[in-house]
């Protein structure tokens, strides 16, 4: 997996304080997300009872040295102990003066969650009788209302602990007021990412997989890149998509959007989508997008084949 920032730029930190509530499925990476926010300078609290969130906000705002950003993790256990209290608190936070609220929801597919629990050898908090799959499905149903309310939904399927921390490091930076644009290449045979805002399918382009000389390579290799971009449709596609994104991105930034994710998919996620995502990043990073943004590229399935 690859994640890089070809042309990051910086803007001043936002003036309003941030309250970030992280919730989602058990095993989806909430602890790693919390560490990423902590590394970014946020004041972080794990498993805080929801009714105490306004008190923490009040104490932070009342102190001259109080943190500019507070992050709270709430999981299924808190929901079972305190019922729908988190939703009520979020409703109250919406109107808090001087604060900007973000509700982040983490999820992953069943196979990823099961694998993580097997590797950690820890019990699922919602499991009864050791049936992890049923616990995951039950939790998914129970947390569906919170997912619908989330400002950002992040799918961590297939990501390592380090990848999750990197992902949330970018997100933590984006909440300071900059717009973070992420270009994600992927393979449809591995499933489309769930957390993209816009998705482009490049399977209409000739597939380098069928060229024996190119098959072992990836879209980051010059030979594959040249083969993909040699096709007139590929060049026109890149130009049209760059034009669309160049129009959209400054307008999203002006509206206060802080995170914009673009998916580029081919069959396996190793050749066409990688080459196109890299070319889009190169073009957009070369002055095609107005405003100040952070631009990242991630190749989700580069090593999957």
Swiss-Prot record:
Q: Sorted alphabetically, which InterPro entries does this protein's record hold?
A: P-loop_NTPase, RapZ-like, RapZ-like_N, RapZ_C
Q: Which Pfam families match?
A: PapZ_C, RapZ-like_N
Q: Which domain of life is it from?
A: Bacteria
Q: Give yes or no: UniProt keyword Manganese.
A: no
Q: Could you say which residues bind GTP here?
A: 75-78
- Looking at the keywords, is Transmembrane helix present? no
Write out the entry's keywords from A to Z: ATP-binding, GTP-binding, Nucleotide-binding
Record-listed ATP binding positions: 24-31
Query: What GO MF annotations does this protein's record show?
Result: ATP binding; GTP binding
Q: Which PANTHER family match?
A: RNASE ADAPTER PROTEIN RAPZ (PTHR30448:SF0)
Family from the record: Belongs to the RapZ-like family.
From the Swiss-Prot or TrEMBL record, give the protein name: Nucleotide-binding protein Rxyl_2009
Annotated organism of origin: Rubrobacter xylanophilus (strain DSM 9941 / JCM 11954 / NBRC 16129 / PRD-1)
């Amino acid at each position: 997996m690859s994640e890089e920032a070809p042309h990051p730029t910086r803007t001043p930190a936002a003036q309003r304080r941030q309250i970030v509530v992280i919730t989602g499925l058990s095993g989806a990476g909430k602890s790693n997300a919390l560490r990423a926010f902590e590394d970014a300078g946020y004041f972080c609290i794990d498993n805080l009872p929801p009714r105490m969130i306004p008190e923490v906000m009040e104490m932070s705002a009342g102190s001259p040295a109080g943190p500019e950003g507070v992050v709270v993790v709430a999981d299924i256990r808190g929901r079972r102990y305190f019922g729908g209290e988190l939703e009520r608190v979020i409703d109250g936070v919406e109107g808090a003066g001087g604060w900007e609220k973000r509700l982040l929801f983490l999820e992953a597919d069943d196979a990823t969650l099961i694998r993580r629990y097997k590797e950690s050898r820890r019990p699922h908090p919602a499991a009864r009788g050791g049936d992890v799959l049923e616990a995951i499905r039950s939790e998914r149903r129970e947390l569906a209302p919170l997912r619908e309310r989330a400002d950002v939904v992040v799918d961590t399927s297939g990501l390592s602990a380090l990848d999750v921390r990197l992902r949330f490091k970018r997100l933590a930076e984006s909440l300071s007021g900059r717009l973070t644009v992420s270009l994600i290449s992927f393979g449809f045979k591995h499933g489309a990412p769930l957390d993209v805002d816009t998705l482009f399918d490049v399977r209409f382009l000739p597939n380098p997989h069928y060229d024996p000389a190119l098959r072992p390579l990836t879209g980051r290799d010059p030979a594959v890149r040249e083969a993909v971009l040699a096709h007139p449709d590929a060049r026109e596609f890149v130009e049209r998509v760059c034009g669309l994104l160049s129009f959209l991105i400054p307008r999203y930034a002006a509206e206060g959007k802080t995170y914009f994710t673009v998916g580029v998919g081919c069959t396996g996620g190793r050749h066409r989508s990688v080459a196109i995502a890299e070319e889009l990043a190169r073009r957009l990073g070369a002055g095609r997008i107005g405003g100040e943004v952070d631009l990242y590229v991630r190749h989700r399935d580069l090593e999957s084949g």
